[in-house]
């Protein structure tokens, strides 16, 4: 498991421009991520996803996020997420640790 505080810094630097995490947070360019763990791809209420995201059919969890965040366009070809990914596994683990905490509050 990664470091929550380091993960928060990564989120602020690389994710917060397009995503929110708090319960009831607004969608931006990307969906609000609250409740993402255990949710199917393309299912945040009120956000318009590509068919690729809706049809991927996986459940978000540590393993699926670890793979997705390395290279989003490879994991879900056709996603509208323009972020290139995080190559360092340790940084992805930190971000996932933060998301696990922040999206479940």
From Swiss-Prot:
Gene3D superfamilies xref list: Cytochrome c-like domain
GO biological process: one example: apoptotic process
Binding-site residues, heme c: 15, 18-19, 81
Positions of post-translational N-acetylglycine modification: 2
PROSITE patterns (alphabetical): CYTC
Pfam families in the record: Cytochrom_C
Location, primary (coarse class): mitochondrion
PTM annotation (Phosphotyrosine): residues: 49, 98
PTM entry text: Binds 1 heme c group covalently per subunit.
GO MF annotation list: electron transfer activity; heme binding; metal ion binding
N6-acetyllysine modification, residue list: 73, 100
N6-succinyllysine found at: 56, 73
GO cellular component, one term: cytosol
UniProt keyword terms in alphabetical order: Acetylation, Apoptosis, Electron transport, Heme, Iron, Metal-binding, Mitochondrion, Phosphoprotein, Respiratory chain, Transport
Localization terms from the record: Mitochondrion intermembrane space
Family, as annotated: Belongs to the cytochrome c family.
Known function: Electron carrier protein. The oxidized form of the cytochrome c heme group can accept an electron from the heme group of the cytochrome c1 subunit of cytochrome reductase. Cytochrome c then transfers this electron to the cytochrome oxidase complex, the final protein carrier in the mitochondrial electron-transport chain.
The protein's name: Cytochrome c
């Amino acid at each position: 498991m990664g470091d929550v505080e380091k993960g928060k810094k990564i989120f602020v630097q690389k994710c917060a421009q397009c995503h929110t995490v708090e319960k009831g947070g607004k969608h931006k360019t990307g969906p609000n991520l609250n409740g993402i763990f255990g949710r199917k791809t393309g299912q945040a209420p009120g956000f318009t996803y590509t068919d690729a995201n809706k049809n991927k059919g996986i459940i978000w969890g540590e393993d699926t996020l670890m793979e997705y965040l390395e290279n989003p366009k490879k994991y879900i070809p056709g996603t509208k997420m323009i972020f290139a990914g995080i190559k360092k596994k340790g940084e992805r683990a930190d971000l996932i640790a933060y998301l696990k905490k922040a999206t479940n509050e």
